[in-house]
C-alpha cells in the first residue's frame, strides 16, 4: 500500500455517536412505558376503536403544540393517563361519554376506546379513556361517578388488570342473564321501564317513534339511522317503511293500548350510514347495494331489547294518531314472507307473549266466515286447537246443525266403513298380513273421526270397536313375531350344536391321524437305525478279515 494514501480512521466518530443518546429526552421512555400499561381485553377481544376523537380541540394551555409533526402522539405535557369507565349502557356512544366528561370541566381527553363483542360488535358497557394530566384523572374519578348517563352512574377505575377483569365479568353476566331471559340487554330509552331519556331534539332524531297505535311508518330518519334487524333476533319486529297514508283526524289511542313499540334501534353515529344488507336477494328480490342514510329496509328492527311498555301517552311525532276503531291494512302493504311477528296494523305483543308463537290474525288476510276473533281475547289469538275437531270448511259446517237426512246418511257411511274395515282386517290377519290389517283399521278410524258427526255417541261406539279390533290384531302380530323369534333362536341353537359336534369329531380325527403319523415316523426311524447298525457290523467284520 502506498504511503501517500490517506488511512481512514473508522473509530473517529464513535464518541459522537455515543453522545447522541443525550439528545433524546428521558420522558419518552416513560411515555413508552405508560403506553405499555394500557392493557388489551381478555379472550382475544382487543378494544375496538369506535371513533378516535381526533377532532377534539386542544386545551388553551397547549396551543403551541399544534405545529408539532403528525407522528408525535403525546402533546399534553408528556402525560398520558389511562382510566376505565364502566357501568355504561350498550348504546352509549363516544359522543355521549365525551359530553359527560366535558360537563365536569375536563377538556384534555386524548382517546376513547370502547370494548366490543367480536361476535356482534355490540359494546360491552365499558371503555378506556386517556386524559392528559393527573388533575383531570382525579377530577374524572371524583366527579363523573356522580353524573347520570342514560339512567346509570358511570364507574371510573384505574387502568389495571383487576378492573379489566371485573368489567369483563360484569359484561359476561349481563349477556348471560339477557340470554336466559330471552330478551337480550336492556333497550335504549323509550323502550324499557327506566326513566332515562335523551335531551330534547336528540332522541327524536335518533329514535323516530310512531305517534298512534296503528301508525308504524316512520318518516326519514336523520344521518344516523338505526341498524338493520336480522330475522330471528328478539325484540319488537320492524315493519315496512314507507310514506304514511291518510290517517284521519287526531284522536286518543284505542282503549287498552298504550305506547306502541318504538321503531328506532340504538343511536347510531351520525357520520356512518347503516351497514349494507344483502339478505333480500334470497327472497326473489334484487340485491341491495350499500344503503344510504335514512329509513331502514323493511322487516328489520333493532337488536334484542325488552318488549314495549303498555302504559303512557304516545310520544310527539309528525303524524296525528288514529281514532279508535278497526284498523285496516296500511295502503295495501303486506309484511314480507320472512318477517315474524304481528302484521302491520295489529296490536303490539304483550310482555309475556312471544309473537313468534302467538301471531295475531292479519287484518289483510280474508277470513273464511267474516267474523273476527273471539271478544274475550285481547290479543286476537285464534281459539285453541282441538285434535278431534275438523278443520277448514268442515269446521264451518260443523257449527251449523245438520238435518236428520244428512245425519243418517253420514252415519250409514261410517257404519259401512267400519264393517268393511273390520272384515278386511280380519281376513288379512288370518293370512298373516298384519301390516295391511293394521293400516286398514287406522285409516277407517281417521275417516270416522274426520266426519261431521264424530261427536255423536254412535260414532264413538264405532271408533271404539275399530280400536279394540286394532289392539287385538297388534297383540297377535307381536305374539307371532315373538314366536318366530323363538323358533329362529331354537334353529340357531340346533345349528350351533351340530357345528360343535362336527368340529369335535373333526378334531378327534385330526388327533388320531396325528398320533398315527407320529408312530409311523418313529417306526421308520427305528428301522433306519437298525440298518445302520447292521452296516457297521459288516464293515467291522470285513476289516478283521
Swiss-Prot record:
The residue ranges flagged as biased composition, category Basic and acidic residues, are 384-397, 483-497, 509-545
This protein's species is: Danio rerio
Bias (Gly residues) ranges: 184-200
Per the UniProt record, which residue ranges are transmembrane? none
How is the subunit organization of this protein annotated in UniProt? Component of the cleavage factor Im (CFIm) complex.
Q: Which UniProt keywords apply?
A: Cytoplasm, mRNA processing, Nucleus
| Name the record gives this protein | Cleavage and polyadenylation specificity factor subunit 6
- The gene that this protein is the product of is cpsf6
Question: What are the annotated disulfide bridges?
Answer: none
Q: Which segments constitute the RRM domain?
A: 81-161
Q: What is its main location?
A: nucleus
